[in-house]
């Protein structure tokens, strides 16, 4: 089977893929990424003492909002009726990192990979925004799709 980009027509014009004839199935996507911070920033996040408030709480809400708005940010992405979106954090004190994981679900005829990736990206950017007064050298890294299930192309695992 030949691999080809499906967001282009035969003349190379950008198109929105027609998903109208695809079966509605439950689809799940999980994405993750990390932000590396300095020790003071890590402690402020961990202890909830950042000047702007609850960094992880605000970042979680931002990530969920971003998942819901993905089709407004990515030009050829379909608007979806997301059935669930979760954002989880793992604090990694040895490496001074916060790992963010998003899980997005939909019952529909197209997947939610872009929503999961957008949720992680926005969550990480919100952490950066809320902490930049004390740490401008933070590094966002390793944003990737970890898993997707459902749909014609089958399951994908990258963990």
UniProtKB/Swiss-Prot annotation:
Q: Name one Pfam family in it.
A: MoaC
Record-linked CDD domains: MoaC_PE
Q: Does the keyword Electron transport apply?
A: no
Coiled coil region boundaries: none
Binding positions for substrate per the UniProt entry: 76-78, 114-115
- What protein is this chain from? Cyclic pyranopterin monophosphate synthase
Functional note: Catalyzes the conversion of (8S)-3',8-cyclo-7,8-dihydroguanosine 5'-triphosphate to cyclic pyranopterin monophosphate (cPMP).
Matching InterPro entries: MoaC, MoaC_bact/euk, MoaC_sf, MoCo_biosynth_MoaA/MoaC, Mopterin_CF_biosynth-C_dom
The reaction(s) annotated as catalysed by this protein in its Swiss-Prot or TrEMBL entry are: (8S)-3',8-cyclo-7,8-dihydroguanosine 5'-triphosphate = cyclic pyranopterin phosphate + diphosphate
Determine the domain of life of the protein's source.
Answer: Bacteria
Question: Which family does this protein fall into?
Answer: Belongs to the MoaC family.
> What is said about its interaction partners and assembly?
Homohexamer; trimer of dimers.
* GO MF annotations, alphabetized: cyclic pyranopterin monophosphate synthase activity
Q: Does the keyword Ligase apply?
A: no
- PANTHER family, sorted: CYCLIC PYRANOPTERIN MONOPHOSPHATE SYNTHASE (PTHR22960:SF29), MOLYBDOPTERIN COFACTOR SYNTHESIS PROTEIN A (PTHR22960)
Q: Which GO terms describe its biological process?
A: Mo-molybdopterin cofactor biosynthetic process
Protein source organism:
Clostridium botulinum (strain Alaska E43 / Type E3)
What S-S linkages are listed for this chain?
none
Q: In which pathway does it act?
A: Cofactor biosynthesis; molybdopterin biosynthesis
The alphabetized UniProt keywords are: Lyase, Molybdenum cofactor biosynthesis
Give the EC number(s) listed in the UniProt record: 4.6.1.17
Tell me the active site.
129
Q: Which SUPFAM superfamilies match?
A: Molybdenum cofactor biosynthesis protein C, MoaC
